[in-house]
Amino acid sequence: MARTKHPAVRKSKAEPKKKLQFERSPRPSKAQRAGGGTGTSATTRSAAGTSASGTPRQQTKQRKPHRFRPGTVALREIRKFQKTTELLIPFAPFSRLVREITDFYSKDVSRWTLEALLALQEAAEYHLVDIFEVSNLCAIHAKRVTIMQKDMQLARRIGGRRPW
């Protein structure tokens, strides 16, 4: 028996979507609130479709902002950050964190030189980048593209790092 092509069957037409009305606000205006009116007077009805001079309003089409496809901006940012050499963690919050940690563990050490803080920040960022690289490899090995907590835990276990 020969195969035949069956045309697509259309269902009944769906109701048209409700259009949003940006000209009128659902909230009552100041004049309506002050006068206690219900908003059904002739002045409010005629003002909805006309401007202050009495001419009908023309609707202006607003262009949608351009959106890139998912992942395009992420890849662009990856390339940008791979090219740069500056530190990505802001210095002030990092130095506050270092001072907070040193206050917690040692009351003797209270002052840090700028070079010591910069060296510590450089090492911390390198460590984070290394962890993320190995975690990404673990996620790819699991046939995923999203890094999960278990990837980071596995990366730390395999790398021989301490559990803290």
Swiss-Prot record:
GO terms for molecular function: DNA binding; protein heterodimerization activity; structural constituent of chromatin. Residues 12-26 have a biased composition (Basic and acidic residues). Keywords: Acetylation, Centromere, Chromosome, DNA-binding, Kinetochore, Methylation, Nucleosome core. Residues 1-71 are annotated as: Disordered. The modification N6,N6-dimethyllysine is found at K5, K30. The keyword Disulfide bond does not apply. The modification N6-methyllysine is found at K5, K19, K30. The modification N6,N6,N6-trimethyllysine is found at K5, K30. One of its GO terms (biological process) is kinetochore assembly. GO terms for cellular component: kinetochore; nucleosome; nucleus. PROSITE patterns: HISTONE_H3_2 (PS00959). It is found in: Chromosome, Centromere, Kinetochore. Residues 40-55 have a biased composition (Low complexity). Pfam families: Histone. Transmembrane segments: none annotated. Residues 1-11, 60-69 have a biased composition (Basic residues). The modification N6-acetyllysine is found at K19. Histone H3-like variant which exclusively replaces conventional H3 in the nucleosome core of centromeric chromatin at the inner plate of the kinetochore. Required for recruitment and assembly of kinetochore proteins, mitotic progression and chromosome segregation. Belongs to the histone H3 family. This is Histone H3-like centromeric protein CENH3. The gene is CENH3.
